[in-house]
Amino acid sequence: MIKKISSTALLFAVIILMQGSCAITNKNPTYKISNQYNVSIDRDFWGIPYIKGNTDQDVAYGIGLVHAEDAYEDLVELMPLYRGQNALYNGLDSIDTDYLVRLLKIHSKVKNIGKQQLSQNILSMAQAYADGVNMYANKHPDNVDLSIHPVTQEDVLAGSYIQHLFFAGLDRDLAQMTSRDETSIPTGSNAIAINSTKTDSNASYLLINSHQPLSGPVGWYELNIESESGWHGHGGNFPGSFLINVGFNKNIGWGATVNRPDVMDIFELTINPDNADQYLLDDKWESFEIEEDKLAFKLFGFLRWSTKQKFRYSKFGPVIEMNGKYFALRHMNQSSFNEIEGWYEISKTRNVYEFEKQLAKRKIPSFNFVTMDSDRNIGYFYNGRIPNRNDALKARQIISSSSSKDIWDERDLV
């Protein structure tokens, strides 16, 4: 997958100044932060922020401020991963994730797909959130890692995209390439809706018990939001997100649990024994599309270096080489950033029926949802962007295929 380089060889290369070295210096960031936002932030007895603004952008800016103030370390912990710079901050052992981010072309997709798919309202909210984080850094430079800043709109969009890949099971699916026979114990979260006819108190209850850590980048952050444009709610999100992912508004509450639908396939390719840059497709040898790029990393805690890597692409998808075998990855949401819009839309619904209508757009690639509205209607929805496959049963495992019939279209859903 990644060209292996010994630490000794790298140190020797530095000493004799071989070609390929790069010098990376830290500079305090210089950037402008908009003063256009009008937001007020109050806190209750428990310290929960109540964020009010004229517009959705004002509220998103406020969310960025409170995330930076209350959960700065959690907020920036995954920022190097989102940028494909994990190894540059955390050392050579972290370079695999940088390779994956580059292989999946996440940053070019943010620019060429995400910014075209998402509404201007959502893009402006993402920018406002980043502005809030950066404003905190600007006012408290001694409390932050200045090398991380400025946090950008692109960081926010890439972070959402990557988080949804992992929640949909990317890490679990990739593990199949090295441990096909291992079976993990199923785990998951809980959400329960009980109508008044089932309770002694004649009250209705919605329980949201998602099994997230109590802290860290995927630990819930509780907040209350209200904009004069009609976006309001109380619930939880993760540091790095400007939306409410679980919670309630004045009319409806909703909980989400990880359901892990089969939204990704891994294809084991047949490689030409006479040319490792070709794979079999419909009884013919097809050449990989090959790109080259540099991955930067830190060595010995202070030395900054880069290595040139090849990135292969097939008709089946981007390709990973592992132990002499070549695997292509195909994900149902590989060309979609609509999950951000999807979370925003469900948070503005007024009843279970509106919630179902928004969820039916299938902008969110996975998750179960349990809901209850103020009229005590309850709903359970198994959600997923599941492709219409040639052989769905075979797709539960790694697929050994050279047939184009197994290459599904991500616009064709079951």
Protein language model annotation of sequence segments:
Residues 21-22:
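N-terminal Sec signal peptide cleavage junction
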Residues 12-13, 398:
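Alpha-helical interaction segments
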Residues 10-11, 90:
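Enrichment for repetitive, rod-forming helical segments
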Residues 14-18:
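Hydrophobic core
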Residues 1-10:
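Bacterial N-terminal signal peptides that target proteins for export
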Residues 26-414:
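Mature extracytoplasmic enzyme cores
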